[in-house]
């Protein structure tokens, strides 16, 4: 069994052990108050994978890190996984946007090979133009296609197949334009849309300049609102909690709950601009707490959470890096090195592998994504 000690206060202390996995099934946790009282340990079953499923090892496979009333239990037999990528059907949506003066113009839309034309006179308005275009598109009777009108735009969505669409309008041809899953510049986005509408902003051909904008409707449904940074709709939202270290929480006197941690989801970017932490696809060897960050070591990498957000290993913005963002570094050495333990010191983090040791630190003692380095 893996034994551990928890000291809540001078008068509330506990001794616990993680019992090894039997021939079948999973391990278990027993805890006693130092006064001899047997404690209640509840195994959480509210998630898709029960918490006890994480207890697959023996005493050599577990590491326990206790911070206040929570103990983080790491099993180095478990390979960390990300949540599955969602199903994303490209070009199933399209947005027609009006710009410029609506007076005395001709507007043309081609939807799935069907051409629609609408002309305005001196009394033309955005509302009359969009109403006419919507009526004409709806009259095509395309199966699965729905059209929604906003103040300066029409949104098309097809539940069956991709949409083929083009549009022109005005004397220069740019008073009516259309986009689907991406735009060249953020200024092309309409002022109204539906809640959680995600559009890729290209900016340039470089991947690092690309980001995703998500529409936040004021009423949580559609209409007026604002655009904020969002996540690539084709990529995973974050960590698979069933494969990550679990928490043992002291919920009351002599009562504990063992459960998955509510890891913060990835909210912005994609795998290029806001990648998963380096321990995804690897086995975590141990956890540590330093500089108001929770950290894990896996293979030759050290990953640390957002500052003061211990369960968040993702950046808050894909466009800029802040000092509070996660830190994720690899040990530089000519020999393979697997970090197996970590010792916090006043100078930094002392990292131990089987044959070498390293120091992770910064010049001013505060670890940040841009100022932290690892040296032998």
Q: Which residues are covered by each model-predicted region?
A:
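Extended, beta-strand-rich, solvent-exposed assembly scaffolds of outer structural proteins
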Residues: 4, 11-69, 75, 95-169, ...
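Post-signal-peptide, soluble extracytosolic/periplasmic N-terminal scaffold domains
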Residues: 85-87
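C-terminal globular interaction/adhesion domains in large, modular proteins
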Residues: 225, 231, 237-265
